[in-house]
A protein has these predicted regions:
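Catalytic or ion-translocation cores adjacent to nucleophile or general acid/base/metal-coordination motifs
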Residues: 301-332, 520-700, 704
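Short, surface-exposed connector motifs at secondary-structure boundaries
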Residues: 410, 491-498, 529-531, 608
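Active-site cores of enzymes that catalyze phosphoryl transfer or operate on phosphate-rich substrates
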Residues: 367, 373-377, 417, 422, ...
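Often metal-dependent polyanion-binding catalytic scaffolds in large enzymes
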Residues: 2-464, 473, 530, 623, ...
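C-terminal accessory/interaction regions of large nucleic acid-associated machines
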Residues: 720-918
Length: 918
């Protein structure tokens, strides 16, 4: 690879042989519909590349073929070919090595485009499978096998009886909190094109003749545009722009999907009476957001930004409610003779007249003798005035709006128009109850050290700078509480009342926040209501959390909030920093132990506890299937409420498609209910006790091995050399810096996302598995490990997630990255532990190669692997060339920028290929 005519030396491109392993059956064929979609996309992509540059197409095919042949070497046992092409990867390296910088950039974009097309094809296939399963459900089945929520509730009914099961159902809550963590490596412009291509592919199956030809022509247009669109945004998004992520998901999925989720479950609950009786499904979906309010380490999130984002969310959701109200109202065309208005509805109409005869006269003109319709149209107009903040005509709270909707609903039901009462009007009520006038609850977060420094500054200089000027950060901290108060005044207390303290070390951290909240206001009546949430995230803090909580509940402000909320309290646990701090095995076990101890402590104090799980998308940050994570929680830790962070690529994957969003919401809600089933609680408790000795050995041994790696001399600089850590920090995928703004000088200050992301890019995934192999070797009892895998949900989920991570590693590619660091000792530690962990995980799950018995997932990864390999080779060669030439001062600024752009293209492409970032 050259910037002009300089090539990487042959020594730079050396590939170390990894030997051969046992081979298994040939890769299975794809399902027909998926195969057809992927073949069509690949054919169009190849045509597009050929139209752009025939040589680019030739190189794309050459590298692709070499990589496909070579990938058999990685998947030992995944192919029956007795003579795999051992030189395939070396040939791919040589081909890429010979390219100039511009052509390498185009090749990287071509492979990245392929992954986007493969991903959307797989997503469309999953949707089609769900539709097929829906069509196969019989009307007389006791449960809907496609809707896991019905299956879970049926099990509760069986185990606990109707009364107890209903009591649990009424408590059901699912709180996803959308964050702006920079883990979505795909830019917004690309997302839009992907969505349009997915829609065209879905339409393609139903068309024929000229319509199909037109569809294919449009596919050509979109795929051509996708390839020609830079995968890298021109600049980092601002926090206000990041809010568009939530708006997109709200518009495309959530606003219309949530009522469908409720209706699907309610239809099963009521059976033949569905649509004729008051719904029994609770509004269990409660979305939150850190976007525009999480200022921990992000100086771009200011008090002004928080106000702007809150206004953006509020205006948008009220606008959506206005449109929905107008649509529902226009369809309530029942005249008074067939559907007489209730006295309550007539009273509401009179109240509306008193408020504005202009609005009621306009509505009456449109809706003569249709009072239900007229009332709804006035309500829609009032929503418009709510956005405009007209004090006389606006709704001052969403509760007032919901109350008016329920008046209309009761009137319709009393008049016998029950299907109208419990149809689209009920959808609108659910939407208002779910999203309010704020769309998502904004949760504020800041580092404990920032609060402490602000108070020190105030004590030294005076609140109003009587003894010297306050620091800008102190002003910003105080302004943050003022912004929170302003949001509450505008959109209600529900819009913003949670304040999270990162790196909570003591009860003093909580006292600091309440004190700053008071100091920010001159008048006590202006002080906003806040619930301060401690976040425990490092190993030492997890181990000490109960002692800290014991002191927190003694704080007067906390006691007041407990009394006001019926003893409700929230505690957040961080999966990311604990994993980077202690290793994945120790972090998993420490979190499980902390949860159990917090639950016992809460029970002692009669506290209604909610545990907030700070999970990432990648396994190294607590990622993995959310429903399995719920079912693996300790007894009493969920209590029919599950709250977690949703970020980056996870948001798009879980909520980007309406059908898949329904599936995800039902699955998590089902697990949240089922976790309180006596059988599940019994299993989790007994298995935790049964395998306590095993987990102690695994914990200690894995922690020792992990710390041995981190404490090796020069590990931190070596890590930055053998991964694209520096380049990942340059990706314009989020407003947040890769390092905390408190003086990042080591791994301790590095955020967990680039830690996980960088290891994934190097095809090592170290953050997900390092230390487990040594721990299993130390324990040595394979039979017990296998029993734990079969019997204990926590352990089986943990092992399955690690097996998936190992399936995405590649020793051949990893060696190329590790060679960048020129440290045989550290490289050997990583590779030896990778082999040892792979050996033990495969023994535990009784597989010959990763994901052997999880066919669909394993096959998807195997098919993608050669294409990811090509991008990884391009990336590692570019990294090596860039760093050597920068050291020798051989590159101009434009050439250096070209290399960085190439690396960023490969980073985006590999992230799309692996389908996870951080």
């Amino acid at each position: 690879m050259t910037d002009t005519d300089q090539q990487i030396t042959p020594a730079d491109a050396t590939i170390v042989s990894t030997g051969t392993g046992t081979k298994g059956p040939e890769e299975r064929e794809l399902p027909e519909s998926l195969s057809n979609d992927m073949s069509l996309c690949l054919r169009i992509l190849r045509d597009v590349l050929g139209e752009y540059d025939p040589q680019l197409l030739a190189t794309f095919d050459t590298v692709r073929n070499y990589a496909v042949k070579a990938s058999a070497e990685h998947f030992a046992g995944a192919t029956a070919d007795p003579h795999p092409d051992e030189d395939g990867l070396a040939k791919a390296v040589a081909t890429i090595d010979a390219m100039n910088l511009h052509d390498a950039q185009l090749l990287a974009r071509a492979f990245a485009t392929y992954f986007h097309l493969a991903n959307l094809s797989e997503e469309n296939y999953r949707v089609s499978v769900l539709h097929q399963r829906e069509n196969q459900v019989e009307d007389d089945e006791a449960v809907d096998p496609v809707n896991e929520l019905t299956t879970a509730y049926h099990q509760l009914l069986t185990e606990m009886g109707p009364a107890k099961a209903k009591a649990l159902l009424e408590k059901l809550e699912f709180h996803p909190v959308f964050t702006a963590h920079p883990t979505e490596a795909r830019r917004k412009a690309v997302e839009g094109k992907i969505r349009r291509i997915a829609e065209l592919l879905e339409e393609n199956k139903r068309l024929g003749g000229s319509d199909k030809k037109e569809n294919v022509r449009r596919l050509y247009n979109e795929i051509d545009a996708l390839f020609r669109t830079s995968p890298i945004a021109l600049k980092k998004p601002t926090p206000v722009e990041e809010a568009d992520t939530i708006l997109d998901i709200f518009d495309n999925t959530l606003f219309t999907t949530i009522p469908k989720v409720y209706h699907r479950f309610n239809d099963w609950l009521l059976g033949d009476k569905a649509g004729l009786e008051q719904p029994q499904c609770p509004t269990f979906f409660h979305p939150g957001s850190w976007i525009g309010s999480d200022r921990d380490g992000n100086p771009n999130v200011t008090a002004k930004v928080s106000r702007q984002v809150a206004r953006k969310f509020s205006d948008h959701v009220i606008g959506a409610l206005e449109e929905a109200t107008r649509t529902v109202g226009r369809n309530l065309t029942m005249e008074s003779e067939t559907t007489p208005a209730s006295a309550e509805l007539k009273s509401l109409w009179s109240h509306q007249k008193e408020m504005s005869e202009r609005l009621t006269d306009k509505a009456a003109l449109i809706s003569t003798k249709e009072l239900h319709r007229a009332v709804m149209l006035v309500m829609a107009d009032r929503l418009r005035y709510t956005i405009e903040r007209d004090a006389d005509l606006m709704y001052h709270s969403c509760d007032d709006f919901i109350a008016d909707l329920q008046v209309v609903q009761r009137s319709l039901a009393e008049a016998g128009a029950k299907r109208s009462a419990y149809g689209p009007l009920q959808d609108l009520i659910w939407q208002a109850q779910t999203f309010g006038f704020h769309m998502v609850e904004m949760e504020f977060r800041q580092h404990s050290v920032v609060h402490a420094r602000a108070l020190e500054d105030i004590r030294e200089h005076g609140l109003h700078g009587e003894r010297g000027e306050l620091q800008p950060m102190t002003h910003e901290v105080l302004d943050t509480f003022r912004a929170l108060g302003a949001i509450q005044k505008r959109n209600g207390i529900k819009a913003a009342r949670r304040y999270i303290i990162s790196f909570t070390k003591s009860a003093q951290n909580v006292r600091d926040v309440y004190e700053l909240n008071r100091l920010a206001f001159s008048h006590p009546e202006d002080v906003p209501v806040i619930d301060v949430i401690p976040l425990f995230e490092q190993l030492e803090d997890l181990q000490n959390c109960v002692n800290v909580l014991e002191e927190i509940v003694k704080i007067p402000e906390v006691q007041a909030r407990l009394k006001a909320t019926g003893n409700k309290m929230e505690v957040m646990l961080g999966y990311s920093d604990s994993s980077k701090d202690a290793g994945p095995t120790t972090a998993t076990l420490a979190l499980h132990s902390a949860e159990s101890r917090i639950v016992a402590w809460a029970a002692k104090h009669d506290i209604d506890l909610t545990l907030f799980h700070g999970r990432g998308g990648a396994v190294g940050r607590g990622g993995g299937p959310a429903n399995r994570a719920v079912l693996a929680q300790p007894k009493g830790s969920v209590n029919c409420r599950f709250k977690l962070t949703e970020q980056g690529e996870v948001i798009f994957a879980r909520y980007g498609n309406p059908v898949l969003a329904i599936r995800h919401l039902e699955s998590v809600a089902a697990a949240t209910l089922l976790q309180s089933a006596p059988s599940v609680e019994k299993t989790n408790t007994e298995m935790t006790e049964k395998y306590a000795q095993m987990t102690e050995v695994l914990d200690n041994a894995s922690h020792e091995r992990f710390l041995d790696l981190l404490n090796t001399p020069d590990f931190a600089p070596w890590f930055s050399i053998v991964t694209p850590l520096t380049e990942v920090g340059l990706l314009p995928i989020g407003s947040r810096p890769a390092k905390r703004g408190l003086g990042a000088k080591s791994l301790d200050d590095l955020r967990t996302i680039p830690w996980v992301f960088s290891w994934a890019q190097a095809r090592i995934n170290l953050a997900a598995w390092y230390g487990l192999g040594s721990a299993c070797e130390k324990f040595g009892d394979l039979d017990t490990l296998r029993e734990a895998y079969e019997e204990w949900p926590l352990f089986s989920t943990f092992i399955d997630n690690i097996e998936m991570s190992l399936a995405k590693t590649d020793e051949r590619i990893a060696k190329m990255y590790l060679a960048l660091g020129d440290d045989e000792n550290l490289s050997k530690k990583v590779l030896d532990e990778m082999k040892l962990t792979t050996k033990w995980v495969l023994k535990i799950v009784n597989d010959e190669w990763p994901l052997q018995h999880r066919h669909v997932l394993g096959q998807a990864i195997r098919i993608r692997s050669p294409y990811v390999d090509a991008l990884s080779v391009t990336q590692v060669l570019a990294l090596r060339s860039l760093r050597k030439k920068v050291d020798k001062e051989e590159l101009s600024k434009s050439q250096q920028a070209g290399f960085i752009y190439l690396i960023l293209c490969t980073v985006s492409g590999v992230a799309a290929g692996l389908q996870n970032t951080g």
